[in-house]
């Protein structure tokens, strides 16, 4: 089924509701994706891109229902990756002599994937045009490393449509094609996720390339992407967002992520977050356990943040493998204008936190002091964690802190009145983990200030996973 994009332009792509992994398993496409291909029917008929290789047969059959394949005059390949040009082999088997217009780098990539050097390739460069009749032309603009060396965009005069390739896209599947037809919150979340996880390394190229395209002084009524929606309602809004995201983007936000073996590093993360919130209540703080969280959501939050705190237990003298992998990804994403601090617990040897600090510095983060704890943090260690959080809040503040937080000395022990109001702390009789009503248990949506009597019956001990019935009033507080 085709969809009219504008006048003689039809979408002939493929929706993929079920795909959950992209680029191997590195990008989680939680809302599916689409592979957008466009058929332009003027005096000359032009196909712009194909679809993912796994849909090759369906694509060619659907295309045959729209047009006699022999009537396709030109094929434009904006990008040679398999989710864009994957159906070329199936298509070219039917129309082997059809001219393919692409960049010089794309020829190498296409041959590397499809192994057909005999195809009728035609190299185009920025500013080259192709007349398709009825007073309309295609204008080509090379966009190397956004995000492959072969990438380019194609502009259709007359209709003022920019076929933008991966730029301005999102892995987002919906029955509706246009941006004004879909859920706006979902759409912009997926746009930012896409930019943060795929295009961030090339941010330094985004602004100059957009400036170059704007320099052609061509009107843009629509932006037709390779994935997700077509921008027809105020298409410049996504361009403006890209310019914003490319400019060393940050919000007043701190991301904390960690991995842990015995919940010791997790206790540190919670205490650090409390210290930050006490000192700067305006900052948004998000905490993630990497073993239980969507990696791409973590990286999107890092992209949005002014700083990141990374925690790891020590395992065989080095950091936990999932932390090491995520830090390696952050190195490749080349985040800018962000600060970092490492923390973690260890037993007899240690070593992971120092190694982590070095890796974060190598990744381009401006480093703050790290923090270590031996074995399970006791009350004194947790006090240090909260103070570390306060210091981080002060060092990383984007604006002067509220005067009340500057002048107030935060007390570590809750006042007698407050303690009495919240009731006693409770200790797991199996593993000795302590529930403190003043802190709550954020990982189970138990807010700070929740007395034990109001903790849900399905609550589980974070360490041993046993229920409320194994908890007893802490001996030191028993009356």
From Swiss-Prot:
Coiled-coil annotated spans: none
Stretches the record annotates as Zinc metallo-hydrolase: 30-210
GO BP terms: nitric oxide catabolic process; response to nitric oxide
Flavodoxin-like domain location: 254-393
Residues bound to FMN: 260-264, 342-369
Binding sites annotated in the UniProt record for Fe cation 3: 428, 431, 461, 464
GO cellular component: cytoplasm; protein-containing complex
Binding site for Fe cation 1: 79, 81, 147, 166
Rubredoxin-like domain segment(s): 423-474
The organism's place on the tree of life at top rank: Bacteria
Keyword Nucleus annotated: no
PROSITE patterns per UniProt: FLAVODOXIN_LIKE, RUBREDOXIN_LIKE
Pathway assignment: Nitrogen metabolism; nitric oxide reduction
Record-linked Gene3D superfamilies: 2.20.28.10, 3.40.50.360, Ribonuclease Z/Hydroxyacylglutathione hydrolase-like
Keywords: Cytoplasm, Electron transport, Flavoprotein, FMN, Iron, Metal-binding, Oxidoreductase, Transport
Cofactor(s) of this protein: Fe cation; FMN
Induction: Submicromolar concentrations of NO induce NorV-dependent NO consumption; as NO reductase is sensitive to oxygen, no activity is detected in its presence. Repressed by oxygen in the presence of NO. Different effects on anaerobic induction in the absence of NO, and in the presence of N(O)3- or N(O)2- have been reported. Transcription is negatively regulated by FNR and does not require NarL or NarP.
Pfam families associated with the record: Flavodoxin_1, ODP, Rubredoxin
Subcellular compartments: Cytoplasm
GO molecular function, one term: nitric oxide reductase activity
Cross-referenced NCBIfam families: PRK05452.1 (NF003954)
Assigned protein family: In the N-terminal section; belongs to the zinc metallo-hydrolase group 3 family.
Subunit structure: Homotetramer.
Purpose: Anaerobic nitric oxide reductase; uses NADH to detoxify nitric oxide (NO), protecting several 4Fe-4S NO-sensitive enzymes. Has at least 2 reductase partners, only one of which (NorW, flavorubredoxin reductase) has been identified. NO probably binds to the di-iron center; electrons enter from the reductase at rubredoxin and are transferred sequentially to the FMN center and the di-iron center. Also able to function as an aerobic oxygen reductase.
Protein name: Anaerobic nitric oxide reductase flavorubredoxin
Organism the protein comes from: Escherichia coli (strain K12)
Gene coding for it: norV
